[in-house]
Swiss-Prot record:
Transmembrane segment boundaries: 12-32, 44-64, 77-97, 125-145, 172-192, 203-223, 238-258, 265-285, 287-307, 331-351, 358-378
Keyword Lyase recorded: no
Keywords tagged on the record: Membrane, Transmembrane, Transmembrane helix
Species of origin: Macaca mulatta (Rhesus macaque)
Record's protein name: RH-like protein
Membership in a protein family: Belongs to the ammonium transporter (TC 2.A.49) family. Rh subfamily.
């Protein structure tokens, strides 16, 4: 019988992380340079503001978003920052190497950081499905694999399907959610008896998690429009995302009250469903020209998110044996699928209205890229999950799931365990 005491990562984590960081520094030294071309100062400032918004979403939004478990909030915030800092470095190099087939150094621009931050956010979303069940070393391995597969998928979509960066990034939520869920399916389960209390939420952590939701809610229009170069598409994305978020927030509170026998509002439902509209608009926001379409999509996404939160843990997760701790499926996965299907339907309607073979071809491309994203996320997630089960990573024992005390120093405690 294996020990229930947490396995120390004192040697494994510093060795792995610092070696990786040293390798990244060498790669940046030999293969990158700052782009020296003159840019319009006003455009540079605007571009930096977009980078700043994305960083706020990644650090504060996704960091606090997963801090609702009362004994796992420290890991949520700090691991999120660590993985973002490491992932952006790897994503910049990866995008540079994959996007230029000819040998030479990679030019680093603000757009490179913007693209890398969005790519890394896919990992931060996937992490929600396994947070509390893996250590930081396993998360680093998971990040390297996911960012590599995600970057490769985008390059394949860009070069084979001829879809630009703004469009092929719309699969980020679908890829991230189902990659994370597949990894979670591979990890040891179920939770042993006596640790259910660690999976409970309390007032203060739930409030911080709601703070993360608010940061994400405020900056989601920037997230959906960050990589769009056409001014009209960017305007449509900002407007449509805002209306969808507004309706999903109203839906979250209203339907949460309706779902409770006493008419009380569930903070967890609010925490998840308020963002559903923004997630659902990630694929189609740039092609929606009327507010009512975005509002209807936000309403449906909110309903799906709350319905998933109420039914999926019983009907779906238990059947498939998936235990994911932070509502990834019905906060990101299902609303994102709704958005992808909506985009395909909107493009199909344009075929009917315009009788254009080119638009019809684009519908087929959109369906193909969605299928590719799903296939690559599930396949790579399965392989990553099997890789994380190897004993060399010193993963935590199931008795220490969702327990910050397994990784953090608590000076006020006289006895560690």
């Amino acid at each position: 019988m294996s020990s229930k005491y947490p396995r120390s990562v004192r040697c494994c984590l510093p060795l792995w992380a610092l070696t990786l960081e040293a390798a990244l520094i060498l790669l940046f030294f030999f293969f990158t340079y700052y782009d020296a071309s003159l840019e319009d100062q006003k455009g540079l400032v605007a571009s930096y503001q977009v980078c700043q918004d994305l960083t706020v979403m990644a650090v504060l939004g996704l960091g606090f978003f997963t801090s609702n478990l009362r004994r796992n909030s420290w890991s949520s915030v700090a691991f999120n920052l660590f993985l973002l800092a490491l992932g952006v470095q790897w994503a910049i190099l990866l995008d540079g190497f994959l996007s230029q087939f000819s040998p030479g150094k990679v030019a680093i621009k603000l757009f490179s950081i913007r693209l890398a931050t969005r790519s890394t956010m896919s990992m931060l979303i996937s992490m929600n499905a396994v947070l509390g069940k893996v250590n930081l070393v396993q998360l680093v391995v998971m990040e390297l694999v996911e960012l590599t597969v995600f970057g490769t998928m985008r390059i394949v979509i860009n070069n084979i399907f001829k879809i630009d960066y703004g469009m092929n990034m719309m699969h980020i939520h679908v890829f991230a959610a189902y990659f994370g869920l597949t990894v979670a399916w591979c990890l040891p389960k179920p939770l042993p008896k006596g640790t259910e209390d660690k999976y409970q939420t309390t007032t203060s952590p739930s409030l911080f998690a709601m703070l993360g939701t608010l940061f994400l809610w405020m900056f989601w229009p920037t997230f959906n429009s960050a990589l769009l170069l056409n001014p009209i598409e960017r305007k449509n994305a900002v407007f449509s995302t805002y209306y969808a978020l507004a309706v999903s927030a109203v839906t979250a509170i209203s339907v949460s009250s309706l779902a409770h026998p006493g008419g009380k509002i569930n903070m967890t439902y609010m925490h998840n469903a308020a963002l559903a509209g923004g997630v659902a608009l990630s694929a189609s926001c740039h092609v929606i020209h009327s507010p009512w379409i975005a509002m209807v999509l936000g309403l449906v996404a909110g309903l799906i998110s709350i319905g998933g939160a109420k039914c999926l843990p019983v009907c779906f997760n238990r059947v498939l044996g998936i235990h994911e701790s932070h509502s990834v499926h019905y906060t990101f996965g299902l609303p994102a699928l709704l958005g992808e299907i909506t985009y395909i339907v909107l493009m199909a309607l344009r075929v009917v209205w315009a009788s254009s073979n080119m638009i019809g071809f684009q519908v087929l491309l959109s369906t193909g890229t969605l299928s590719l994203a799903m296939a690559m996320s599930i396949t790579s997630g399965l392989l990553t999950g099997l890789l994380l089960n190897l004993k060399i990573w010193k993963g935590p024992h199931v008795a220490k799931y969702f327990d910050d005390q397994a990784f953090w120093e608590f000076p006020h405690l006289a006895v560690g365990f």
